[in-house]
Amino acid sequence: MTVPSASRDQSQGRHLVAWILQAMLATVFFAMGIGTLAEIPAAADSVDQVGLGDCFRLLVGIIEIIGAAVISLPDVAVLGAVWLATAMGFAVLTHLYILEDSPVRAAVLLLASVLVTVLRRDQFSWLRSRFL
């Protein structure tokens, strides 16, 4: 096996892992966003416990759905990953300091979003050259 072939295999593997994570994150965040907007107890309870009212619940649901949509778009998936990582960073802090419960689910989603950001980092240069 030559070096270019090994590099191509790694790139294809990285690409496949990124797509799998993106599909998982899009599915999870779309379901969470719909659940939060529809006030399904499993999804909306922790948002309601923050105590900021319905406007905050709507904002969280919209943030989750936007993130799910953007991470699904091939050319700008890295922006969706950064968006979701930021949201999950705040979710971890909220679970630790306001709700005082386990942030494990939010932390796992944060790590998955960061991993997609790392795997799709080449999109930053493409976006910069295209829009700046």
Predicted feature locations:
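Short juxtamembrane and helix-loop transition motifs at transmembrane-helix boundaries
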Residues: 37-48, 63-75
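Solvent-exposed, well-ordered loop and adjacent helix/strand elements within mature globular domains
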Residues: 27-56
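N-terminal hydrophobic or amphipathic segments with adjacent small-residue motifs
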Residues: 20, 27, 45, 55, ...
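Core segments of alpha-helical transmembrane spans in multipass integral membrane proteins
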Residues: 31, 52-72, 86
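Solvent-exposed, flexible loop/coil residues
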Residues: 41, 56, 60, 108, ...
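Extended, low-polarity transmembrane helix blocks
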Residues: 1-31, 73-132
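Hydrophobic alpha-helical context, especially transmembrane and signal-peptide helices
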Residues: 17, 24, 42, 52, ...
